[in-house]
Amino acid sequence: QRALQYAGTFGYTVWLRPQDAWLGKGVAASGPLATRMGLSGIPVAAELIALHTIFELVRSTRARVHLCRISSAAGIELVRQAKAEGLPVTCDVSVHNLHLIDVDLGYFDSRTRLSPPLRQQRDREALRAALADGTIDALVSDHTPVDEDAKVLPFAEAEVGATALELLLSLAVRWAQADGVGMQRALATVTHGPASVLGHSLGTLSASAGRLVEGGVADLCILDAEAWW
């Protein structure tokens, strides 16, 4: 609470990953699949408890908080309610949780050992809808490179993380095409959305970051939306 009070005093945004440390000790999302595979689960409650705690602290301190990597349908519903209440909160979702679900663990594929874990299809659908309607402010790569030796291990022993920076833009476009989301909204989730979350922390770039404005920095990326690689 004191950290949020200090941050609020100086106008800083606090970045938090909403996951209860005790309930989040598992290695896969709780559910029938994790049970069948004999993997310790991370329940949705791990995210919900953390979100409730964070929102109560935001109510008392009025500090701005950014929630990193929301992963569940119930979690994004709490975020939607918090925003409707007027709490100064923003959030993002990773490309992993936007495109994959728990069945993509395959036969203990340690490349899918991620945090937050891949959840059920209903969670993915809720996240995709929330990104489309603006409840989720940004799409992130959650780029966490892991040494190959740390991944070629039994699933529960493998290190958490995966590379994704090189896939962020293409997966944003793929999501837009699959869900009928306009290209402008899709690109905003990886440009203007993240820049808005960062705000004044971008310094002199804050006036033009993530968008094209006269006199702004010409930070451009050219892509072929029809190309495959």
What are these regions (language model features)?
Residues R36-R62, R111, A138-L139, T144-E226:
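His/Asp/Glu-enriched, well-ordered alpha-helical/loop segment
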